[in-house]
Amino acid sequence: MIETVDIEVVSVNVSLEKGTIKLPVNSIEITEKGIVEDAHSGSWHRMLSLLGVESFERFSKLANRNIAYGEFAENITTKGLELFTCKPLDRFVNEHVALEVTQIGKECHGNSCAIYREVGNCVMPKEGIFARVLKSGSMKSGDVLQYIPKVFRIKLITLSDRASMGQYDDRSGNRIKEWLHEYFDQYKYPIIIDYSLIADDAAMLRNELNNAVENIYDFVFTCGGTGIGPRDITVDVVSKLIDKEIPGIMDQIRLKYGENNPNALLSRSIAGVMKNTIVYTLPGSVKATNEYMTEIVKTMLHLVYMMHAIDAH
């Protein structure tokens, strides 16, 4: 069960110029480009900024003075959650607006920042967060936002005639599950894995893939059927459904492991994007599963950020 948190908006703040403090106002109007009459609004991934009073309190003690809301140039000052613990793609919503987190912290502007010039330090580069607008509306002090953590939904499909008939356990599929839990746990992203074990059947696989795309799964992993045998149909089915192929991932895996084991070069595995879903096709052996997942996890988050137009460089 994913826990949501209600946080309070304690101040809303705007400025007409970048690099200056923002001043509290009675309310703000949020459009698809950010806050009306605020210098940071625009068609980019940092349309507006948020900072929690929890950060204010810590910095006030270090600076030995009170810090006014908006002085860190945040648009929305909140209470009830350490905002820097949020992650890209988390959301803040209520009946009026919906915001999606795009960045945690930012580069410090040094002497061009008003607060830095005064006290020689700033909390925004480490503890401020940035968001884009998913739903336009108004916001004012006293409003409540619900924090909804991003949950990655993953479809795992193992294709095996014999395993689907119960002749042996799906060890490779179980190993992929372990890899996924270990990977996302380190980034503190919750995941839901929906698992299917089917025969090497093109129609069944196509149905599973179409359902995953229709239900907007973040990732699909297939296991098995990447060779050239008469029942190896996975790549043929997937290749017809992807909109954009990502050849470098699987090419690199084949070359790396094929150097010591030439049989690894025979895999036809592919990776790509089906609308809003990233898909990887893996071979069916446990050994190959470990090899492929070792390389795949190195770029998974960066890939999903790219697909959601989040600049994670």
Set out the residue ranges of the language-model regions.
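N-terminal small/polar loop signature for handling phosphorylated ligands or for N-terminal nucleophile
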Residues: 183, 189-223, 227-241
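Short alpha-helix capping/helix-loop boundary micro-motifs
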Residues: 77-80, 84-85, 128-137, 141
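Electropositive, beta-rich accessory/interaction domains or terminal extensions
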Residues: 1-106
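Short, basic/aromatic beta-hairpin or loop at an interaction surface
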Residues: 65-75, 113-128
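Mid-chain, well-packed structural core segment of small domains
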Residues: 81-114, 244-265, 269
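Glycine-rich phosphate/diphosphate-binding loop of Rossmann-like nucleotide-binding domains
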Residues: 151-200
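Proline/glycine-rich low-complexity loops and linkers
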Residues: 234-313
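Loop/turn positions that initiate beta-strands
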Residues: 89, 96, 136-144
